[in-house]
Design a protein with these regions (language model features):
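Flexible, glycine/small-residue-enriched loop-and-beta-strand segment within the central core
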Residues: 67-77, 82-151, 172, 177-178, ...
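Short glycine-rich loop/turn motifs that provide flexible caps or phosphate-binding loops at active sites
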Residues: 10, 139, 158-160, 174-175
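Charged, amphipathic alpha-helical interaction segments
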Residues: 33, 37, 106, 160-161
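C-terminal/domain-terminus segments
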Residues: 151-164
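Short, flexible micro-motifs
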Residues: 14, 143, 162-164, 178-179
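Terminal amphipathic alpha-helical/low-complexity segments used for targeting or macromolecular assembly
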Residues: 1-60, 178-183, 187
Length: 187
């Protein structure tokens, strides 16, 4: 029989009040609190805390405080990753970033969602859908990336305040609510 954690990571309905998951969330809260309290010049401490928190991080990862996430271990970032102030990642399912990604202040990325039917939703169970963000992506300030979205590679730019509800092809600028293609980019 699968654990609630296995169900969660696989995107199946699961019980978020499971003891193991509650301990994991508390551990992530502790690490993010310690990270958010670091001083600006203590890059080594910040880097070590991020390596302990995140599920995978290549070289040159920089995140500005305040940063918040559910578990951390479902967040995987490529080389040259930068997230500015006040980014939030609800990572009940994997959130994966390619190389050379930049997040402006206040970006929210959600892999968590809830059943639509009220009886099922009121049971307290939830589920998620993974989010994948390709290489060379810049996400503008206050943008929201919803569960299940895949963003392509090569100079994808998500405009400030965009609400991304559907997959995004490569080589485009998107913006709006819901986000739509504004411009095709030639790479």
């Amino acid at each position: 029989m699968r654990t609630e954690k296995e169900k969660m990571i696989n995107g199946d309905l699961y019980e978020p009040v499971d003891e193991e998951l509650m301990k994991d969330r508390l551990h992530a809260r502790k690490l993010t609190r310690l990270f958010n309290q670091t001083i600006e010049t203590d890059i080594e401490k910040r880097t070590n805390l991020l390596k302990e928190l995140l599920g995978g991080a290549k070289d040159n990862v920089y995140i500005e405080p305040n940063f918040k996430c559910d578990y951390g271990y479902n967040i995987h970032v490529g080389e040259n990753f930068f997230a500015n102030f006040d980014c939030i990642m609800l990572d009940i399912c994997p959130i994966r970033f390619g190389d050379n990604c930049m997040l402006a202040p206040g970006v929210h990325i959600y892999s968590a969602t809830h059943p639509l039917h009220p009886d099922e939703r009121n049971s307290g169970k939830e589920y998620g859908e993974p989010v994948t963000i390709g290489d060379n992506v810049w996400i503008g300030g206050g943008a929201i990336i919803n569960p299940g979205v895949t963003i392509g590679d090569n100079v994808v730019v998500v405009g400030a305040g965009a609400v991304v509800t559907k997959n995004v092809q490569s080589n485009v600028v998107i913006g709006g609510n819901p986000a739509r293609v504004i411009k095709q980019l030639v790479v």
